[in-house]
A protein has these predicted regions:
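Extracytosolic ligand-binding ectodomains
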Residues: 2, 7, 29-399
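Cleavable N-terminal signal peptides
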Residues: 16-18, 28-29
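Bacterial N-terminal signal peptides that target proteins for export
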Residues: 4-17
């Protein structure tokens, strides 16, 4: 006589349910999925006074997206998913905008964008009532995360506010509270300086003096004479913050200031999403794969593009669909998490579409620290101590 005990029945039931789930998953994965991703770049006018030494390679960003597609296809081949990448470079705004409409008519819905603020705003208007995913990988302006929010654009590049907060937290942690602020004369430098002023106020730092560099001196020949005089102040300072996006003068500040003090911001210690010195959490393997593919080191723009493609690919892996409306809903949901060689999962802020992430504090040849700094507390996640939190931002994309 065959007797089924309660324990055996539970065992058979679990196996049966597992088998049914396996059959369901096999059936769900029976149809292959393909997804085309468009990388679109608008060539920016060169900034006067920028040294060729600091110019990024022309393929910055695209190579990161290319590696992400390769990594995604490694997983995708087991799930019957395939990703492809197209590349388009525009030199004029009309050509840039027309390309999106053409791609949209051909059925493409995922776009990786390397373009300035004005064109991102235009694209967001174009994307209204369209099921498209737009990823900003290069524009760091705080305006897009605070006062001029874009409902169709996700930001994988950290904002100026996130970088300023990362540095300000480190200064607070090291008790370097007195700051000399030096800014360039360009509009982008003024905005960067304003971003740091916000961070200084937020974390209780004191800016003892502000100076603007608007000289045309060839610092390659005169830095040792010019900069000590320029950085002489009545009050003592612990650190010099440089706001110089194009690096026309900032790199000449270290070791030339009147007082022997560290330089942060646009030179010296910088806050970046990625740098070649990052090696933890599997980053070394990513760095090596990138060097093998691109024959150069991975920079922040490459990493931002990598994150954009991986955000899409992870969503496709999870949902097994290429329908853009479903991918958009998932990426913007609390369920979305992205593993990104940062030691923790990343996600997008629902109120501004900004990807929250730790930032590396680096100088050219070493990692110094990572922000958020120890002791920084937040009711939801300490990652939101970097940049505009929900209560600070005017964005209402999720409200």
């Amino acid at each position: 006589m065959f007797v089924v005990t309660r324990a055996k029945f539970k065992k058979y039931l679990v196996k049966s349910i597992g088998f049914c789930l396996w059959l369901f998953s096999v059936n769900a994965l029976s149809s292959p999925i393909t997804l085309d991703i468009s990388y679109v770049k608008l060539v920016k006018a060169p900034v006067a006074g920028t040294s060729n030494f600091f110019k990024k390679p022309d393929d910055s960003g695209f190579q990161g997206a290319k590696l992400a597609v390769s990594d995604s296809n490694t997983t995708g081949k087991f799930l019957q998913q395939h990703f492809s990448l197209s590349y388009f470079v525009a030199t004029k705004t009309p050509q840039f905008l027309d390309h999106f409409e053409g791609q949209y008519q051909q059925g493409r819905r995922i776009f990786i964008i390397d373009a300035p603020l004005a064109q991102l705003v235009q694209l967001d208007r174009w994307a209204k009532n369209k099921s498209v995913l737009l990823f900003n990988i290069s524009e760091t302006a705080d305006e897009l995360r605070d006062s001029q929010c874009l409902s169709s654009v996700l930001h994988t590049i950290p904002s100026d506010a996130m970088k300023s907060d990362a540095l300000a937290q480190w200064l607070l942690y090291r008790r370097m509270n007195k700051v000399l602020l030096i800014q360039g004369s360009k509009d982008e430098d003024v905005l960067l300086a304003n971003s740091f002023k916000r961070s200084a106020k937020r974390f209780g730092l004191k800016i003892i003096d502000e100076k603007q560099w608007d000289f045309n001196t060839d610092l390659r020949r005169s830095a040792q004479q010019e900069i000590p005089l320029f950085t002489q102040t009545v009050k003592d300072y612990d650190v010099v913050y440089a706001a110089d996006k194009s690096k026309s003068f900032a790199e000449f500040l270290p070791f030339n200031t009147y007082l022997p003090r560290p330089v942060i911001g646009s030179a010296g210690l910088e806050a970046l999403a990625w740098h070649s010195v990052i090696e933890q959490w599997g980053a070394t393997q990513l760095q090596n794969r990138f060097i093998d593919m691109a024959d150069r080191k991975m920079n922040e723009l490459d990493f931002s593009a990598y994150l954009a493609v991986r955000s899409v690919a992870e969503s496709v892996h999870k949902l097994h669909t290429n329908k853009s409306n479903e991918l958009i809903a998932y990426i913007n949901s609390v369920d979305f998490e992205l593993a990104a060689y940062k030691g923790r999962k990343l996600s997008f802020r629902p109120w501004s579409r900004q990807l929250r992430m730790p930032l590396a504090l680096v100088h050219p040849h070493a990692l110094v620290s990572q922000s958020p700094q120890p002791g920084m507390l937040h009711p939801i996640t300490e990652l939101d101590t970097l940049g505009f939190d929900a209560q600070e931002s005017q964005c209402e994309l999720s409200r």
